[in-house]
Structures are given as structure tokens and as C-alpha cells.
Amino acid sequence: MRRKIVAITSQYLKEPISQIVSELKLNCDIQVVSYNKFDTISEVYDSYAGDTDGFLISGKIAKAAIESTAHAYNRPIVSFEIDTAGLYRALLNLLISNRDLDMDRIILDFLIPIDGGCTATAFLKELDIDTVPPHINNWTKALTRTSISTIENHVLSELIRMWNNNEMDMVLCQYSNILPELRAHGIPTIYPLPSVSHIRDLANEL
């Protein structure tokens, strides 16, 4: 019997993730569904958990939001996002395409709530590639249900403040739910997607 997997992602990512899923060629059925905000993602999980074998969740915070709530069915969950090496490549590709870019003025949104700096310079030079994931994981583990619900608004407000104060030129975004609002404010954004092989490896864990 074929496994059933549900991928939960933001509305913005539903189409590109559906395209990636179509290229996986795995011996399972993967359905891609969307959520609107961290406060409601557990409801989306619950609506599918009774009839699925596992979940792919877009982002560690979204996964933490689900795990912070009690559920009638506890299915295996893995989170997916671009990995650290992929973020490095995305930033280096930006620099190669435009040598005039100032890495001090490119902001990585997911680093805003975490101590250690949120610029591309901080990520590329001050944060060791081998220590970034544990650093983020430790912060994620300390999150509470209340703090999770406020993260996106906090990050969005800080990015708008920085943009209005001319403190940045671009956002490398991983909180995909805030992308429409960032673009409505005219803030240049990029969203690097995880690779097909990365999603395939995670799906095989379920």
C-alpha cells in the first residue's frame, strides 16, 4: 500500500513546492496543502492527520507550532527549508550577479529574532557554516506557543522599520507568509527554495 504524505506550506510556496513534489518520483502519494499563519497550522495538521502516514512541514518554526499543541493523531513530522549550504550559495550567487551589492545591507529574515546579527555579512563571515543549524535549533527548541504566534509580526515590523530607515537593500526571506506584505512595501526580496533532492531525502525519512 502506498504511503500518504501531506506537505504543509504557506500559500505563497504551494505552487513551487507542488512543482518540486511532481519531480520526486517516489513510491508514495504527496498532497500539498497550505496554511495562513502559525496560529492556524495545527488545525491544518489535524484535518489531515487521521488519514496520512507523515508530514513534510515548511520550516522549523511551523513544525514547532504544530508540536506545541496536543493532537488526536501524532504522525511523523519533518521540516523542510533550504539548508545552510544552499543559503550560502544563494548569497554568493547574488554577489556574483551584482558585485556592487553590500552584504551588510542584505538581511536574512530568519536571523532577526536570534542573537548574532541578521545581515548577510554576519551569516557569511561571523557565523560558521557548521554551527548555524545548531544555533538555530537551540533557539527553536526554546520557543513557546505564545512566542511562536508573534514571530512573523515581529520580523515583518522590524524589516519594514529597517527599510523605512534606509538600513537595508534586500531581504533573503524564509518566512514566506510575510512575502506579500514585504513586496507591498516595495521591499526587494528573494526566496531560495530547497532542492528536489533535499525534499526527496526528507520524504524518504517518513
Where are these regions (language model features)?
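Alpha-helical/coil-rich non-catalytic "connector" segments in signaling and regulatory proteins
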Residues: 1-206
